[in-house]
């Protein structure tokens, strides 16, 4: 597969996955708990696949490539927490760690994006997208920590999920313009 096509497909796969996961985290959703879990699982699998494809589309080792790999690892960590029959605390910890790995992965692309003499509008949108994804994932991780302490963190998770989805969508749109 051509690297540009791989990056484009990976970008949209990841964006659609984040939207599915955000829908799953929406409190007023009409889906039952099983459907929400399945949507979140599918969303995280799509995000992991998309990030892996985006990383594979880059020939050279860059912070952006490493960041995409780290995001794929983070999503895979969340997936393992959903699929493997651990106790609830272990599942929550895997989700927290997976979200925080994704946050760091999104942030790792920023130095590459900022390392230019002339910043275009596409570069600015990519920066915004990466920042939004990093912030959204960090909020999701924070919500998990809050919930582990027995407090209500669902609203923070909801907001973080949609912030991440907006960032991924922006980056997919930029990739489409290339």
In which residue ranges do the predicted regions lie?
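Glycine-rich, hydrophobic membrane-spanning regions of integral membrane proteins that mediate transport
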Residues: 1-131, 138-162, 169-178
């Amino acid at each position: 597969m051509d690297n540009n096509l791989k990056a484009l497909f990976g970008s949209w796969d990841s964006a659609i996955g984040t939207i599915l996961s955000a829908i799953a985290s929406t409190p007023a959703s009409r889906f039952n708990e099983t459907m929400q879990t399945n949507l979140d699982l599918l969303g995280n699998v799509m995000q992991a696949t998309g990030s892996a494809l985006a990383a594979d589309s880059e020939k050279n080792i860059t912070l952006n490539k490493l960041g995409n790999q780290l995001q794929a690892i983070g999503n895979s960590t969340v997936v393992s927490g959903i699929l493997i029959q651990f106790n609830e605390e272990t599942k929550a910890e895997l989700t927290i760690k997976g979200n925080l790995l994704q946050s760091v992965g999104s942030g790792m692309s920023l130095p590459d994006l900022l390392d230019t003499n002339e910043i275009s509008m596409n570069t600015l949108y990519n920066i915004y997208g990466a920042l939004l994804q990093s912030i959204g994932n960090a909020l999701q991780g924070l919500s998990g920590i809050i919930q582990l302490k027995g407090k209500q963190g669902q609203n923070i998770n909801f907001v973080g999920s949609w912030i991440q989805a907006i960032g991924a969508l922006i980056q997919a749109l930029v990739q489409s313009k290339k």
